């Protein structure tokens, strides 16, 4: 049995999500785009979660501990494209105090299973800063392959950061590559 489970985030989760984001703000700021102060409000998260309920281009999951149901992270499939692409972008984080326990790797495996199963996608891709060694390991352990380096890909803390690009296809996933 897994130590974590995924559940689509609901409006009722907004308070726990905001508390986690505020607690981990300094930790997350080194890896994520700079957020305006308005991002860190309960109203903003309630509204965003409500809007996402019917959005088929976005799948937003909480990472919860199986024992106690504590929200310990978030994992998302965004920009879900249909038609000839059948692709999504993967993003995730685990609360700093829960890092290093394998939760991110397990969450990635679970969400990719859903992407290729329930959602019927063909490809999932992710981008990660090379210096984020823990996240690189998560993707590699979960079966993603490195595709290249995108120079000055995303602005993080005011600086344009390079990102390694990773992906996995449904065929690779099913073959256990």
Question: Which residue stretches match the model-derived regions?
Answer:
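GNAT-family acyltransferases
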Residues: 1-97, 160-177
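Amphipathic alpha-helical segments that line or abut small-molecule/effector binding pockets
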Residues: 11, 15-19, 105-117
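Positions that flank functional sites
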Residues: 36, 131, 154
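Conserved acetyl-CoA-binding loop-helix of GNAT-fold acetyltransferases
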Residues: 92-94, 100-114, 133-141
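Conserved GNAT acetyl-CoA-binding A-motif
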Residues: 118-127
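Structural motif
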Residues: 119, 141-142
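Conserved catalytic-core motifs of GNAT/GCN5-like acyltransferases
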Residues: 127, 145-163
